[in-house]
Amino acid sequence: MITTSAISTIREHVKTWRSKGETVAFVPTMGNLHQGHITLVNEAKKRADHVVVSIFVNPMQFSANEDLDGYPRTLIQDSDKLMAAGTEILFTPTPEIIYPKGLAQQTYIEVPEIGDELCGASRPGHFRGVATIVAKLFNIVQPDIALFGRKDFQQLMIIKTMVEDLSMPIDVIGVETIREQSGLAMSSRNGYLTIEEKHSAATLKQALDSIVNAIQRGEATQQAITTAKKLLITAGFTPDYLEVRNANTLRQVTAADSELVVIGAAYLGKARLIDNVSFSRHSS
């Protein structure tokens, strides 16, 4: 595995692969890798001739009161995991390489509407930072496909929208969420949970499932959400939001929509956990 922080090195390798008619898959990450990330790499290997992974803790997507400085940086362990998984190039740029003019002078990309709702409402500017870094990494790596976990469902939809709106020749693929045995979605931020909190954390998935089951039984959506919030509060969570949206657009649900997603975020101790469950309005 080649590890580099140089944009020119990435481009040289991609140019060589392209000259042979070979395809490139890209998995962007912020490091502190878990099995969910490795699943993305494994899926990338199935879909393309070459796999590039990036590790970059992106300062643009953190607000002033968030955990940029405390975000876990585990490059040695991450590198070992990626090498074992068969990654060919690991791209590890510094903020100075990505944002040479500094954040204040950086051109940015903003996806309207869906970038301002849900997690975007709780974390102003977050998805502007996400869209900007992903667009920049796409320009550097120039992949045929890029893979993202469906756990970050809103992020996935925003990136798909950006790629479509800007006519980027990249196939964005969402990969199913990898979960702990308890049902808790794997996340780098699970490391913020105490042992006791980790036992309670699976309640978020249970709350989302309860909304799905209630809607499929014909119950009112708002009542299902209210009941689920009570379940979270009892388990020690502070709910941020729980909502049901169109699973294909992330827009508000209309009577005609059948493919839905229940999406939520809640605080547990020092961690802000997110999760989602896609479902059909009427159970089969």
From Swiss-Prot:
It catalyses: (R)-pantoate + beta-alanine + ATP = (R)-pantothenate + AMP + diphosphate + H(+). This is Pantothenate synthetase. Catalyzes the condensation of pantoate with beta-alanine in an ATP-dependent reaction via a pantoyl-adenylate intermediate. Pfam families: Pantoate_ligase (PF02569). Its EC number is 6.3.2.1. ATP binds at residues 30-37, 149-152, 178, 186-189. One of its GO terms (cellular component) is cytosol. Homodimer. One of its GO terms (molecular function) is ATP binding. The keyword Transferase does not apply. Keywords: ATP-binding, Cytoplasm, Ligase, Nucleotide-binding, Pantothenate biosynthesis. It comes from Shewanella frigidimarina (strain NCIMB 400). (R)-pantoate binds at Q61, Q155.
